[in-house]
Structures are given as structure tokens and as C-alpha cells.
Amino acid sequence: MESPSLPMTAKDWTTTSLHRVFAMQGGEDDLSYVNNSDSQALAITLSKPILISSLQSIKLFSDQTPIKITDLGCATGSNTFTTVDTVVETLQRRYTARCGGGGSPEFEAFFCDLPSNDFNMLFKLLAEKQKVDSPAKYFAGGVAGSFYDRLFPRGTIHVAVSLSALHWLSQIPEKVLEKESRTWNKGKTWIEGAKKEVVEAYAEQSDKDLDDFMSCRKEEMVKGGVLFVLMAGRPSGSSSQFGDQDTRAKHPFTTTMEQAWQDLIEEGLIDEETRDGFNIPAYMRSPEEVTAGIDRCGGFKIGKMDFLKIVEYSDEKQEEWKKDPVSYGRARTNLVQAAIRPMVDAYLGPDLSHELFKRYENRVSTNQEFLHITCFYGVVVFSAIRV
């Protein structure tokens, strides 16, 4: 069968075009990020003490201007609201303790993400939440743009958070898109198990992106402000993107994803070059890489840095899946679609994208081994004070 004309090619993955199509799956159906972000919610819950501790340790801002908070890479759903609530409530308690009931300033929260994010859904959910909270805890606004660029005037942000977002790169490394080079990622759609040159190209892009992120925050934040970041990461000393073999085998971006792409090739729906031109723009940094990036930037003092392991599913849920592998396959496919479906749609087109994820679901549903091994998602979390 002749390969169809595709909407995008490997060379289209410039910063501009990736920003145009990259977003978590919008809406609130079974594929949406809203309904497939439990692991991120658990990571936020486990790291919450680090955020609260950093907010309790800083000197309170003394002027009467509103306290400005931003969530960088907010996506959609309750995770962003939960974290902003934590910031507001923690600081309100401190101001009340110091000044009494009328001593707390007003708060503004800016929800930031790429223009392709589903801001309509985000603010629909926020409006529903604020009806329950009435009166609202803060004034809210949306900012469409990349957190690898400046988003706010100099010295205006008091608290900046970024949750499960900074492992997404600003672009596919240009070297990886050069077909005749050693860095062409042949046979792969990500870097786990890829050639050393491919991994190094991703690491270089990761360092550049982290430098850009930190430099922008350095300009935007007030002295004494808090930067709190949680991102997918890997353990210290691990050359792999993961810390254990089971996670390496079971992670949504690895074995099953590669098999699903290979199925399309073997069925004549796409050719190998089409598969090789698609690369997932994610890199799991180690704590050492994150620390080095903060140090290169200067202007921040690290308060706390930690690596956490987030279990994919509880033991009880795992036992449920063993009895119903078809539902497990569907749930796992929904999870990966929530993260990368918009990007795959843009690359393959909706029809071929649908075929890819059908094969992904079938692979997961029929892999009995997956039901008996545990996958952990690693996260690096840190708090830092603007100095």
C-alpha cells in the first residue's frame, strides 16, 4: 500500500511548528489530560511539603501590591488549581498570623501554557471551582506562550511553579532531524535505547532549554520569590532515562510504542523513514543536571532538591487490571494519548494516528507480562529562592 501524504515531515519540527501543535489532550472525554493525570496529581501531593516549606521560610513581601503567582505549563484540570490554592492558603495564613484578619494582600494567578493548550476547558473548570470557593481566592488570567521565553515584566512574579512540564523540550534537536547524520534516530521514536549520539543531542537541547527557562525566571521574579519545579526525571548516576528494567520495558514511550509504529510499517501504512522522523520531545534530567543548570544561571539559591518514585498504579488497581486486561489496555492507551495524541495527529494525520493507537492498545491488552510488573515514574522536584 502506498504511504499517504502526511501533514508534517521531520524537518517541520522546528520550535515554531512544535509549539503550534504540542499540548496535552484537551476537552474532558476519556482521552483528555483532565481524566488522565492521576500520576501527576500523586507526584504533586508527595512533593507538596517541599513547596509549603519553601513558602514558610521566605520573608513576607511587605508592599501592598497583589502577590503574583504563575503556573508555567499549566495544561488543564485540577492539578494546577490545587497547587495555586496551596500557595495562596499558605501565604494567607502567614500574613494573617503576622497582621491579623485584614493583613493579607490580594493574589493574582497567571495560568501559562502554549497557545495550543485548551484554555477554554481550563477556565471553564476554574469558573466551576470558584463558584464552590466563593468568594474566589485569587484573580486569574491566562498567558499563552512558551516558558522558554520571557512571559512577564521584570521583577513582577513572587511565586512561580511548574508541574510535570519542564521535561518537555522546546524542540526536537536539529541534529536528530538530519537523515544522513549519526544522530538520525533510525528505528526509534524516542531516546531510550537510542545511539549515544542521539542521547547526547537530546542532552544538549535539554541543557539549552533549562538555561533559557532559568534565565527568564531570573528576570521575571522578585528578589525573595519562590521557584518550585516538578518534572519527570531519572535517578542520579543512571545513563538510562529510567531507574529499573521493568519501568524501561513498560513505560508508555518505549517498547509498546515502538512495536505499534512497527506494526504500521509492516502493514504498509507508513514507511520506515516516516517512523524515524517522529521523535518524542522529552528528556528526563537527573538531579545533577538540574543543579548544574541552576548554578549556570545564578540568581537562585536551591532550598531543596529531591528525586521521587511515583508508582504507576496501586496494588489494588493492579489486581483489578489482571482480571480485565482489555480495560487495562484502554486505560494505558488513554494515558499516552493524553500526552502526545495532538502531536501524533499533526504528524501522521488523524486517521493514521487512530490506527497507531489502536495497535498500541492491542499490544498492551495482550501483553500479560505488563500486568505482573510495576512501572515507576521518576520525578525531580526542587525549590529555589530568587536572590
From Swiss-Prot:
Pfam families: Methyltransf_7. Optimum pH is 8.0. One of its GO terms (molecular function) is gibberellin carboxyl-O-methyltransferase activity. InterPro entries: MeTrfase_7, MeTrfase_capping, SAM-dependent_MTases_sf. S-adenosyl-L-homocysteine binds at Y33, C74, N79, D113, L114, S146, F147. Disruption phenotype: No visible phenotype, even in gamt1 and gamt2 double mutants. GO terms for biological process: methylation. Its EC number is 2.1.1.276. SUPFAM superfamilies: S-adenosyl-L-methionine-dependent methyltransferases (SSF53335). The keyword Lyase does not apply. Mg(2+) binds at N185, R275, D276, F278, N279. It comes from the Eukaryota. Down-regulated by Zn(2+), Cu(2+) and Fe(3+). No effect of K(+), NH(4+), Na(+), Ca(2+), Mg(2+), Mn(2+) and Fe(2+). It catalyses: gibberellin A4 + S-adenosyl-L-methionine = O-methyl gibberellin A4 + S-adenosyl-L-homocysteine. Its cofactor is Mg(2+). Binds 1 Mg(2+) ion per subunit. Methylates the carboxyl group of several gibberellins (GAs). Substrate preference is GA4 > GA34 > GA9 > GA3 > GA1 > GA51 > GA20. No activity with diterpenes abietic acid and ent-kaurenoic acid. Belongs to the methyltransferase superfamily. Type-7 methyltransferase family. SABATH subfamily. This is Gibberellic acid methyltransferase 2.
